[in-house]
Amino acid sequence: RDLADAKLRDVLSMGRSQLTQSNFSEDWEGKSNGGGVPVNSELEYQVIKDNACPMLVRTYSGTKDVPGLARIHERALNISWHALSFWWFDELDGRGNNTLLENLREHFEAVRYIVTTGKPVEPNVPHHFAFRGADDITYIVSGFLAAKAIKNMGANHMILQNMLNTPKYTWGVQDLAKGRAMIKLV
């Protein structure tokens, strides 16, 4: 409440569980659930939003029906911005059942919907490449391609995520150079 009284914003960034990402609104009986917040209904999202108030709320998309989840996140959370993985959380990394092409189609459909809401889009793509050992050029190019795709679909606002010290074997100056190059291109 102190932040709100000072006219400042804070964000609840909800790291949802694997089952929330892959099996939202399905029966979870007997399924193991990795770490994160286990949310399985719009009502649970609404309770989180209400309890987080006056903070803004945001979360990542899921591994299937990405456009449907974007709509649910709008309705139930009034999500501050939408974070999408584009290339990831599919057959490519084993965290979802979509092929890469199906995943991109779902994400692009979701972006087209998000554009109608006027909310920003965050392509949390580059750091996923870095987590998987990609070089800095791949990191930068993936961020550029995601930004270009979002812009071409009509988004007016994008949140560019730039994680430092990823992967572990880099050091600060390299990360800053990588980040500055990506910002310059985007």
Q: What annotation goes with each model-predicted range?
A:
Residues 25-26, 170-172:
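Short acidic, glycine/proline-rich loop/turn micro-motifs
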Residues 138, 171-178:
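Short glycine/threonine-rich loop-to-helix capping motif typified by GTGT followed
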Residues 1-147, 151-153, 157, 161:
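Catalytic alpha/beta active-site cores
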Residues 166:
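Acidic/histidine-rich catalytic neighborhood
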Residues 186:
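Conserved, mostly hydrophobic/aromatic
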